[in-house]
Each structure stands twice: as structure tokens, then as C-alpha cells.
Swiss-Prot record:
This is E3 ubiquitin-protein ligase RNF19A. It comes from Homo sapiens. GO terms for cellular component: centrosome; cytoplasm; cytosol; membrane; ubiquitin ligase complex. Zn(2+) 3 binds at residues 219, 224, 241, 246. GO terms for molecular function: ubiquitin conjugating enzyme binding; ubiquitin protein ligase activity; zinc ion binding. Pathway: Protein modification; protein ubiquitination. Zn(2+) 6 binds at residues 329, 332, 340, 347. Widely expressed, with highest levels in heart. Ubiquitously expressed in the central nervous system.
Length: 838
């Protein structure tokens, strides 16, 4: 027994010597401790049972006995006793280690239990904090106010800052940062806790509500936010601010300071002029590209007039006012609907400028004409595409659905075949329904919505021409101001921003005329002489109607097209009783209009140095017993010196002695006689290819100018009969064609004469002293005998109590003969002497 124990201990010691790894020792110790906890009785009784090794049967070793081993046997016994004592000591040390590990494990378990208790308490504390979705910080629940309209929560600091920013930028429809639900004003008051911001909020809310009222008018005084709800005050437009200490009087219509002796347009024009002068003097008022904001980037809201800045970042043109909530288009500045950008209004969703008038009209005509063809083409393509495409789409969807599943091929193919067959049956029905509904909708849009939207916006470019049919205007409104600088305009048109004083507001007496003209293709309008632009004057004479309109452009290099339409329908027997309204647009500030006696006289026809000319066609009808009055208006540019031409006629003379004047040369003439009615058609053309005729006319003028006599208007006043005649001879006579006239006589006593007469001067001291040299007046007459001389004609005009009676002496000198196409034309000299009695 003792030998077995010694052998076991020796084997155990050998095992200890072999297993010197501390990790393996610890694992074995843990295993032993576990066995002890399980309550093994055999391990507790034996001291050596602490080490449980598996019983391994080893093969018996063959012993070899030698002579030396016999002599060393005693020494081995002593060594074994020593090893036994060492094994006992090792077992004791291992047991001490086990006891220490057990105590450590118990302490670890105790610390784990205490730490678990601490973690539970910490988790309970962490559960009381919530993360803010705005600042991403964790705060306690009491820092998250409850909102009435939604369940989202944010910390009070973030909400307060959010509300401050929204109110300071006048956005009063404040919604939740995480959804679109709006805040209740009570919640806003509780979160802000700021009386000043709440007053601003309430003021913006009130302003937003009042702006929607069409009868609300805000006081125009600075720093006055008082509003007047003026219901039914259109007939009495004078309003007074009711705020204490203000009392500002303003107009109901234009919403500006009260203007007692002016119309709204005149007051607006005066304000625009003063604003323009201040802008010129102070460069800090006007916005420029250097300051970072262009004038096109700042526009007022069409409803509340609050100024809005649009960033030039390629954003869309659908704008929403932050003050009143008005949705409008940035290009046309009009309140828009859902179909605004789909209709041919010319406004694009992302563009920087609207379409031109020409492009809009072409788009409209193309839509109206090509809509049936386009719709039929779309329907013809859609029907087969739907019939073929729907089954293919259904088959692919079913195949993709069954592709990744454990389904047999037979079942999958059956499902695909069934779906395709069903879709083949259904697809024609779907195509028919789609085309049957879509085609009427498209036709209704093209022929219903498009014309209505165009007529409502006034952008169709089609207007009535004084009962003479339909007129289509192709001139581009947006290109008029090309090349000009930013002009300060007080919500007026470009024409109103210029110096356009309206002189006289009389009725035309039934005389109707329509003449719209813009400058021809000119690159150098400023090449015309300065004396024309500085000394030009427009005469509104009795018996005539001169209507001038300014096209309103500050351009130097402009490319516009001339379009003239004249309707002449008035027939009268006398010359008196007519008045005209003239709008001056010249650069000169001292240009004036004088009402004087006489017939309608012509003005200047300047030509560009590069040969650009203005072409006008006028059709005149006359009857033997009636005389026709013509009225026209021309639209000229600021930099050019083109002047309005007027044609007229005189009556009240004996039959056979009367003469009619014409202000343009005739290029073509024909003889037509229809039942006693005489019809004359003429076309005025100014060309530069008649150099030989120009030289002849210049020689004639030079010879006649030396013989012309200058009559006196009074004892102390200089000549008035020769004003501005040199300009006419230099610009008009130098480029005119040879005059061709024809006349068909209904009776031997009826004669018609055509004359080219220069304009009468304005009676002004500074103009009379600088009047140019005299020029002869060429008269082309065609009578039966070509020898009749006009007698003295008296034209009298009464104005108030003062009578001015100029006497015109007409007599003819030597006749100039010219043969052209077997027609004889006689050019006579005309000398005019004007005498006045005041």
C-alpha cells in the first residue's frame, strides 16, 4: 500500500514537473473547485483526492537487472523518501492556492452583484434623459415642452432659437421642425417668454391677414404701420391715417402721398423722375453688380409689395412671399396657378427671362395648328405600345417573382403563361380607355385652357385694329430696353420713366388714326446731327391731329422692326375745331408745342449715315366733294432725330382753286376712274440709290434759296418763314426720289395739287435767332393746262378773343420740265410770304 502511494505521488510529481504552464494549472484548480462544490465525498476524505487524474493503463516495461543496480539500490531508497516529502509539501501548497482562489472568486461574485445593483440604478437614471433631434444632446424630460399639435419633442433651447429666427424673418406660419404641423400661438408664447418677440409675431400675423383684404390701405409714411380699411372709397380716394401723431393723407388708388392737382399717372411719373435724379446723384441708392445685388434680383411682391431678393443660384421661378404667402412668378410678377408654367404665358420654370412676343405667338399658332396632328400621332404610338408592352411587363414581373423561390418549373411557367394571357386580353381595353380619356383632355387643354389663359393675361399679342380686322403685334417688349442701364422706375412702364410731358388734352373730333412705329435697324442712332435734337419742335396746328408716342428705350444699339398700320376714316368739310395731343420724347428739355394756324406741315426725315431708312406706306382716298384728314403718330427713339410726319388738306376754297398738300413723294401712281370717284395711292420710299436726282435737287435748291425772300412777322421779330428749312433740304431733299404724279379728272373744274412744304417754326426768341438758311419749296402741280396759278389764300384761326390771320401768297416761277417714262412732270417754284396782324 505504501509502495502504491509512493508510486502515485512520484507519478503526480512527474506530471507536475511536466505541466509547468500556469494557465493549465489554473484551469485544473478551477476544475477541482467545481468538483468540491458538487459535494464529492471521495474527494473530501482523501488528502490526495484533490488531484483527480484519469487512470491510464500503460504497457509493462521490461526491466534489465545489472550488477551496478544492485549496488545502487540503497541510494535510490533514500532518494524516493526525499521525493515523497517534497510531494506532500507540493500538495499542501496546491491546497493553499485553491483556498485563495476560492476566496477571490467569492469576492469577485460579491463585487459583481454590487456592480449589477449600480448598473440598474444608472440605467434607471439614464432612462430619465431624452436625446434632442435638433442639437443631438441628452436632456432631462422636464426640458422638453409638450406641443399641442404634434407628438414630436425638442429641447426648449432649440425651440426658442428656432422661433426667434422664424419671427425675425416674418414667417408667422411656424410649423414643427420635424413635421408640417403648425405651432399653436399659446405654445409659442410659453416657449419664447419674450414680450417683444410676441408683439412682432402678432403684428406680422395681423399684417398677413390685412394684406388679403382688397380694401386695406397702408399708410405710406415712414415708420407708420397703420392700416385703413377703406370700403367703397374709390369715388373719394383721399384717405387720412388715423394714428395719433401721423395724420398722413394718401390716395386710395395709387397708395401714395395725396396729389390734389394731379392724376395718379402724373404723380407716379413725377416720383419716378425725382427718384431717377436722386439715383444719378447718389450711387449708393442704386443697386449694381459690384454691390452684389442686381436690380433684377430685387422685386416687390405683387400682393403686399414687400421686397424680395432672389438668389441667382439656378432656383425655380415659383416664389412664395414670406409676409403674405402669395405665390407668384418671378418673371411676370403675377399671381400664378398650377397651370401657369404649362400654359403659353412665356414664363419658364427655371429660365431667367420670359419668351419674346414673337416666340409666344409662334408657339400658340403651332399649338393650335399642330395639336390634332400631334395628338393623333401620340395616340397612334401609344395604342400598339400599350397592347404589346403590358403583356411583356407582366411576364417579366411574374418571372422575377418566382425566380428565387423553390418552385417547380412547371408551376412557374404556368403562372407566367396565365399572366401574359390575361394581360393580352386586358391591354386593348386599357389602351382604348387611356386614349379615349387622354385625347379629349389634351384637346380641351389646347383649345380651351390655352386661349383662356392667354386672353386673361393679355399676352396673346392679338388686338383689334379700330374695326379693321385683327392685328398681330410681333414687336418684342422685352428687347426694347436692350443695352440700357438700370432705370429707376416707380412701378411704371419704361415710357413713363422718361421726360414725356403731355401737352394738351383735347378731343380729336372723331378723327381716328393708329400708327405704331419703332426705329428701323440702326446701329448708330447718335450719328444724326445735334442741331436736330436740340432745336427740334413739334407743331400741333389747327385742322390737324399729330399724335406722337415714345417707344421708351435708352438704347444706343437697338434692333427693332418698323411696323405701320394706318386707318383713316374721317371726312370733313372744314379745318377748324380739331386739336391734337402730342407727347414729346426728345432729349432736349426745351422742346415745345405751339398751336398755330395753317395746314398740317411735315417735319424732318433724317437718314442714318449707313443708309438705314424708314419706310412708310399710306393709302389715301379722296372724293370730289369731300376732303380727308389724316392723322398719324410715329414712335421714335431717344437718341434718334426722326420726327413725325403729318399729312393734311385744306378746304373752304372755291371749287377749282383748292389745293391739297402731301408730305411724301409718290413712287408709283396709276390712273383709275370709278364713277366719279378719284382714288390716288402713293407710297413714300426713301432710298439712297438716287444720286443723280439728289444732285439735281441740290442744285435747284441752291439756286432758289438765293431768290427767296424772308417776310417779317412783326417790326422787331426776325424771319419765321425759313425756320428749319435747311434741315429739310439737307436730310430730306437729298435722298428723295423723283416725284411722279398722276391725276384722273372727273370734271374739267376739279384739280388736285400735291405740294411738299417745309415746317413752320415755333415762335420763340432763342430759336428765331439761330434759324437756318432759307430753302425753296418745290411744288408739283398737274392741271389740265399746266398754266394755272394759285391765288391768294387766306387761312384764319380764332383762339379766344385774339385773332391771328396769316396771309399766304402763292405764285409760281419758272417751270422745270422733266420727262420720265413718256410722262411730263412740271416742278414749279413756290414762294411763301406770311403776314400776320396782331
Amino acid at each position: 500500500m505504501q509502495e502504491q502511494e509512493i508510486g502515485f505521488i512520484s507519478k503526480y510529481n512527474e506530471g507536475l514537473c511536466v505541466n509547468t504552464d500556469p494557465v493549465s494549472i489554473l484551469t485544473s484548480i478551477l476544475d477541482m473547485s467545481l468538483h468540491r462544490q458538487m459535494g464529492s465525498d471521495r474527494d473530501l476524505q482523501s488528502s490526495a483526492s484533490s488531484v483527480s487524474l484519469p487512470s491510464v493503463k500503460k504497457a509493462p516495461k521490461k526491466r534489465r537487472i545489472s550488477i551496478g543496480s544492485l549496488f545502487r539500490r540503497k541510494k535510490d531508497n533514500k532518494r524516493k523518501s526525499r521525493e515523497l516529502n517534497g510531494g506532500v509539501d507540493g500538495i499542501a501548497s496546491i491546497e493553499s492556492i485553491h483556498s485563495e482562489m476560492c476566496t477571490d472568486k467569492n469576492s469577485i461574485f460579491s463585487t459583481n452583484t454590487s456592480s449589477d445593483n449600480g448598473l440598474t440604478s444608472i440605467s434607471k437614471q439614464i432612462g430619465d434623459f431624452i436625446e434632442c433631434p435638433l442639437c443631438l444632446l441628452r436632456h432631462s424630460k422636464d426640458r422638453f415642452p409638450d406641443i399641442m399639435t404634434c407628438h414630436h419633442r425638442s429641447c426648449v433651447d432649440c425651440l426658442r432659437q428656432y422661433l426667434r429666427i422664424e419671427i425675425s424673418e416674418s414667417r408667422v406660419n411656424i410649423s414643427c421642425p420635424e413635421c408640417t404641423e403648425r405651432f399653436n400661438p399659446h405654445d409659442i408664447r410659453l416657449i419664447l417668454s419674450d414680450d417683444v418677440l410676441m408683439e412682432k409675431y402678432e403684428e406680422f400675423m395681423l399684417r398677413r391677414w390685412l394684406v388679403a383684404d382688397p380694401d386695406c390701405r397702408w399708410c405710406p409714411a415712414p415708420d407708420c404701420g397703420y392700416a385703413v380699411i377703406a370700403f367703397g372709397c374709390a369715388s373719394c380716394p383721399k384717405l387720412t391715417c388715423g394714428r395719433e401723431g401721423c395724420g398722413t393723407e394718401f390716395c386710395y388708388h395709387c397708395k401714395q402721398i395725396w396729389h390734389p392737382n394731379q392724376t395718379c399717372d402724373a404723380a407716379r411719373q413725377e416720383r419716378a423722375q425725382s427718384l431717377r435724379l436722386r439715383t444719378i446723384r447718389s450711387s449708393s441708392i442704386s443697386y449694381s453688380q459690384e454691390s452684389g445685388a442686381a436690380a433684377d434680383d430685387i422685386k416687390p411682391c405683387p400682393r403686399c409689395a414687400a421686397y424680395i431678393i432672389k438668389m441667382n443660384d439656378g432656383s425655380c421661378n415659383h416664389m412664395t412671399c414670406a409676409v403674405c404667402g402669395c405665390e407668384f412668378c418671378w418673371l411676370c410678377m403675377k399671381e400664378i396657378s398650377d397651370l401657369h408654367y404649362l400654359s403659353p404665358s412665356g414664363c419658364t420654370f427655371w429660365g431667367k427671362k420670359p419668351w419674346s412676343r414673337k416666340k409666344k405667338i409662334l408657339w400658340q399658332l403651332g399649338t393650335l395648328v399642330g395639336a390634332p396632328v400631334g395628338i393623333a400621332l401620340i395616340a397612334g404610338i401609344a395604342i400598339p405600345a400599350m397592347i404589346i408592352g403590358i403583356p411583356v411587363y407582366v411576364g417579366r414581373k411574374i418571372h422575377n417573382r418566382y425566380e428565387g423561390k423553390d418552385v417547380s418549373k412547371h408551376k412557374r411557367n404556368l403562372a407566367i403563361a396565365g399572366g401574359v394571357t390575361l394581360s393580352v386580353i386586358v391591354s386593348p381595353v386599357v389602351a382604348a380607355v387611356t386614349v379615349g380619356i387622354g385625347v379629349p383632355i389634351m384637346l380641351a387643354y389646347v383649345y380651351g385652357v390655352v386661349p383662356i389663359s392667354l386672353c386673361r393675361s393679355g399676352g396673346c399679342g392679338v388686338s383689334a385694329g379700330n374695326g379693321k380686322g385683327v392685328r398681330i403685334e410681333f414687336d418684342d417688349e422685352n428687347d426694347i430696353n436692350v443695352g440700357g442701364t438700370n432705370t429707376a422706375v416707380d412701378t411704371t412702364s419704361v415710357a413713363e420713366a422718361r421726360h414725356n410731358p403731355s401737352i394738351g388734352e383735347g378731343s380729336v373730333g372723331g378723327l381716328t388714326g393708329s400708327l405704331s412705329a419703332s426705329g428701323s435697324h440702326m446701329d448708330r442712332i447718335g450719328a444724326i446731327r445735334d442741331n436736330l435734337s436740340e432745336t427740334a419742335s413739334t407743331m400741333a396746328l389747327a385742322g390737324a391731329s399729330i399724335t406722337g408716342s415714345l417707344s421708351g428705350s435708352a438704347m444706343v444699339n437697338c434692333f427693332n422692326r418698323l411696323e405701320v398700320q394706318a386707318d383713316v376714316q374721317k371726312e370733313r368739310y372744314s379745318l377748324s375745331g380739331e386739336s391734337g395731343t402730342v407727347s414729346l420724347g426728345t432729349v432736349s428739355d426745351n422742346a415745345s408745342t405751339k398751336a398755330m394756324a395753317g395746314s398740317i406741315l411735315n417735319s424732318y426725315i433724317p437718314l442714318d449715315k449707313e443708309g438705314n431708312s424708314m419706310e412708310v406706306q399710306v393709302d389715301i382716298e379722296s372724293k370730289p366733294s369731300k376732303f380727308r384728314h389724316n392723322s398719324g403718330s410715329s414712335s421714335v427713339d431717344d437718341g434718334s432725330a426722326t420726327r413725325s410726319h403729318a399729312g393734311g388738306s385744306s378746304s373752304g376754297l372755291p371749287e377749282g382753286k383748292s389745293s391739297a398738300t402731301k408730305w411724301s413723294k409718290e413712287a408709283t401712281a396709276g390712273k383709275k376712274s370709278k364713277s366719279g370717284k378719284l382714288r390716288k395711292k402713293g407710297n413714300m420710299k426713301i432710298n439712297e440709290t438716287r444720286e443723280d436726282m439728289d444732285a439735281q435737287l441740290l442744285e435747284q435748291q441752291s439756286t432758289n434759296s438765293s431768290e427767296f425772300e424772308a417776310p417779317s412777322l412783326s417790326d422787331s421779330m426776325p424771319s419765321v418763314a425759313d425756320s428749319h428749312s435747311s434741315h429739310f433740304s439737307e436730310f430730306s431733299c437729298s435722298d428723295l426720289e423723283s416725284m411722279k404724279t398722276s391725276c384722273s379728272h372727273g370734271s374739267s373744274d376739279y384739280h388736285t395739287r400735291f405740294a411738299t412744304v417745309n415746317i413752320l417754326p415755333e415762335v420763340e426768341n432763342d430759336r428765331l435767332e439761330n434759324s437756318p438758311h432759307q430753302c425753296s419749296i418745290s411744288v408739283v402741280t398737274q392741271t389740265a393746262s399746266c398754266s394755272e396759278v394759285s391765288q391768294l389764300n387766306h387761312i384764319a384761326e380764332e383762339h379766344g378773343n385774339n385773332g391771328i390771320k396769316p396771309n399766304v401768297d402763292l405764285y409760281f416761277g419758272d417751270a422745270l420740265k422733266e420727262t420720265n417714262n413718256n410722262h411730263s412732270h412740271q416742278t414749279m417754284e413756290l414762294k411763301v410770304a406770311i403776314q400776320t396782324e396782331i
